[in-house]
Regions:
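Rossmann-like NAD(P)(H) cofactor-binding subdomain of soluble oxidoreductases
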Residues: 54-134
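Short "domain-exit" segments at the C-terminal end of structured domains
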Residues: 135-139
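NAD(P)+-binding Rossmann beta1-loop-alpha1 motif at the extreme N-terminus of oxidoreductases
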Residues: 1-51
Length: 139
């Protein structure tokens, strides 16, 4: 399954890590700037405090989502305040299914802005207890 995780914050990084556990998934992350460089150079590094381990995943990144790019599913993990900026980009993209994770306060406006059938858009929540995503400046 071709999967895009749109956003490389704490939720996006943890979600990408979990999705990569299934080797059938082909996961790509949309990240920008210094954080994209960090993931490209050193991998996606997560310190799992409860399990007392650190994982490093190699995951391809993109900086922008082109309208013609197609994924089986796109997980949108940006903060709710960032949605107005990215909804036009998502609306133009030809991927069929979108899951908005952790930014549900604007669900109705997201559905209206995306102009897609309601069964092609979902809203979810992710439990992120006891993990730490290593920031670029700390490693």
């Amino acid at each position: 399954m071709r999967i895009l995780v749109y956003g490389a914050g704490v939720q996006g990084c943890e979600l990408a890590h979990r999705l990569l556990q299934n080797k059938k998934n082909v996961v790509t992350m949309l990240a920008r700037g210094e954080w994209k460089e960090r993931i490209d150079q050193k991998g996606l590094t997560i310190r799992h405090w409860a399990q007392l381990k650190t994982t490093v995943d190699r995951v391809p990144t993109i900086e922008t989502l082109a309208p013609e790019e197609s994924y089986d599913i796109v997980f949108v993990t940006v903060q709710a305040g960032q949605l107005p900026e990215i909804l036009p980009v998502l609306k133009q993209n030809k991927s069929e299914f979108f899951v908005f994770v952790g930014n549900q306060p604007h669900a109705r406006s997201v559905l209206q802005a995306m102009q897609r059938p309601a069964d092609k858009i979902a809203f979810g929540f992710q439990n992120l207890s006891l993990i730490h995503i290593s920031e670029p400046t700390r490693l």
